[in-house]
Amino acid sequence: MTILSAITSISRPNKISKSVVSSNGGASLSLSSNSVACITACGGSSYSYSSSYQSSGSGFSYNSSYSSSVGYSSSVGIATGSCHSLCH
């Protein structure tokens, strides 16, 4: 059974986190201390994607990651915090 959910979390006017996850197994969403969205999706042909953008004064930080159970994974991050997602 496919689970499709879209979650939008706004913690501050200058920080917006938006996440979308689709999985035919199970999915879990967790927020780290700096409100960066972490998504883990487990199951056959499932994937997970998370992204966040923060703007404060003259500085900014952006973090995004994508992973798939079919063997492809990629991550790019420039952020002050860290986010870890694991499938068991």
From Swiss-Prot:
Query: For this chain's UniProt record, which GO biological process terms are given?
Result: sorocarp development
Superkingdom assignment: Eukaryota
Name the protein family.
Belongs to the hssA/B family.
Q: List the protein's name.
A: HssA/B-like protein 61
Lineage, please?
Eukaryota, Amoebozoa, Evosea, Eumycetozoa, Dictyostelia
